[in-house]
UniProtKB/Swiss-Prot annotation:
Protein name, as recorded: DNA-directed RNA polymerase subunit omega
Oligomeric form and interacting partners: The RNAP catalytic core consists of 2 alpha, 1 beta, 1 beta' and 1 omega subunit. When a sigma factor is associated with the core the holoenzyme is formed, which can initiate transcription.
UniProt-listed InterPro entries: DNA-dir_RNA_pol_omega, Pol_omega/Rpo6/RPB6, RPB6/omega-like_sf
Source organism of the structure: Enterobacter sp. (strain 638)
SUPFAM superfamilies, alphabetized: RPB6/omega subunit-like
Keywords: DNA-directed RNA polymerase, Nucleotidyltransferase, Transcription, Transferase
GO annotation, cellular component aspect: DNA-directed RNA polymerase complex
Length: 91
C-alpha cells in the first residue's frame, strides 16, 4: 500500500479544508455512485484512492462539478425522453 502525503494533495487543491471536502466527495462517488477509480486501486480504500487522484491532478472540485452537471443533464434528457414517449403513447 502506497503512502499518500497529504501535503502534495493540499498543494493541488489550495487548502486542507477544501481537500477534505473534495476527497470525501470523490470517495463517496466511488463507494456509492459506482464511479471507477482513475488510478490503480492497489487494495486501497476509496479515501486513499481519492487523495492519490487529487495528488496526480486527475480530480479537482471544478472537475467534479463539471462531471456532476453533465450527468445531471444526461439524466434530465433521459427523463424528458421517457415522459415524451409516455405522452405520445397516450395519444
Amino acid at each position: 500500500m502506497a503512502r499518500v502525503t497529504v501535503q502534495d494533495a493540499v498543494e493541488k487543491i489550495g487548502n486542507r479544508f477544501d481537500l477534505v471536502l473534495v476527497a470525501a466527495r470523490r470517495a463517496r462517488q466511488m463507494q456509492s455512485g459506482g464511479k471507477d477509480p482513475l488510478v490503480p486501486e492497489e487494495n486501497d480504500k476509496t479515501t486513499v484512492i481519492a487523495l492519490r487522484e487529487i495528488e496526480e491532478g486527475l480530480i479537482t472540485n471544478q472537475i467534479l462539478d463539471v462531471r456532476e452537471r453533465q450527468e445531471q443533464q444526461e439524466q434530465e434528457a433521459a427523463e424528458l425522453q421517457a415522459v415524451t414517449a409516455i405522452a405520445e403513447g397516450r395519444r
